[in-house]
Regions:
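Short, structured surface patches at the beginning of a domain
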Residues: 1-131
Length: 131
């Protein structure tokens, strides 16, 4: 039997406005749902990364997101788990860069509500169609 790679997740949660927080996208609600998902998938949670009141317009302007990428590059996690893809990025260009970076570091992206899962062939195909 082959050794299965340990699944270590960084949970990424973000809200840009108070309205989003009130409409069911609060940081607490996102975190709770993603913790449940990680438990279901038997992922170890390395850390929860929170960007509050920050737009998805530019990935470089989000401190927690950048810390998560640094931790991924350092080999501390191999999955990034988010509630929806728009919590990660709204930019096609940023998504292209992110997917390439994830592939380079053998890391996968899972977005619970959008059925994004780059650890599967169908999931990678779906994300590539978006870019």
């Amino acid at each position: 039997m082959e050794n299965e790679e340990k699944k270590i997740a960084g949970i990424y949660i973000r809200v840009s406005t108070e309205d989003q927080a009130r409409e069911g996208f609060s940081l607490g609600e996102q975190e709770e749902k993603l913790r449940q998902l990680c438990k279901y998938k038997d992922f170890e949670i390395f850390k929860v990364y929170k960007d509050a009141g920050i737009s998805a317009k530019n990935m470089k302007d989000r401190p927690a997101f950048q810390q998560m990428l640094d931790d991924m590059k350092a080999g501390k996690l191999n999955y990034i788990v988010a509630y929806k893809l728009d919590r990660v990025t709204r930019s096609v260009r940023d998504l292209e860069v992110l997917i390439s970076t994830l592939e380079q570091y053998h890391c996968y992206l899972i977005c619970d509500r959008d059925d994004v899962n780059t650890s599967t062939a169908n999931g990678r195909f779906f994300v590539r169609m978006l870019t």
